[in-house]
Amino acid sequence: ISSQHLCGSHLVEALNLVCGDRGFFYNPRGIVEQCCHRPCSMFELENYCN
C-alpha cells in the first residue's frame, strides 16, 4: 500500500479502517504532521491504534 497524504475526515476514515474495533487515540499535532503534511503508510497509521 502506497503512502499518501491524509487530512481531516480522510485521516479519521483511514484510522477507523486500520484500527477497527481497537479504536485509536487522536493526537492532532503528531498525526497531522506525519500524515497530512507528509505522506504516511498504513503501518504508520497503526501506531495510533489503541
Curated annotation (Swiss-Prot):
- The disulfide bridges present are C7-C36, C19-C49, C35-C40
Q: Which domain of life is it from?
A: Eukaryota
Cellular component GO terms, alphabetical: extracellular space
Q: Does the keyword Secreted apply?
A: yes
Q: Which GO terms describe its biological process?
A: glucose metabolic process
Q: For this UniProt entry, what is the primary localization, expressed as one broad class?
A: secreted
Name the SMART domains for this protein. Answer: IlGF (SM00078)
Localization: Secreted
UniProt keywords, alphabetically: Carbohydrate metabolism, Disulfide bond, Glucose metabolism, Hormone, Secreted
Per its UniProt record, what Pfam families does this chain match? Answer: Insulin
A Gene Ontology molecular-function term?
hormone activity
The keyword Protein transport belongs to this UniProt entry's keyword annotation: no
Q: What PANTHER family does the database record attribute to this sequence? A: INSULIN (PTHR11454:SF9), INSULIN/INSULIN GROWTH FACTOR (PTHR11454)
The similarity annotation says: Belongs to the insulin family.
User: What function is annotated for this protein?
Assistant: Insulin decreases blood glucose concentration. It increases cell permeability to monosaccharides, amino acids and fatty acids. It accelerates glycolysis, the pentose phosphate cycle, and glycogen synthesis in liver.
Summarize subunit and interaction data from the UniProt record for this chain. Answer: Heterodimer of a B chain and an A chain linked by two disulfide bonds.
**The name this protein goes by in its record:** Insulin-1
Q: From what organism does this protein derive?
A: Thunnus orientalis
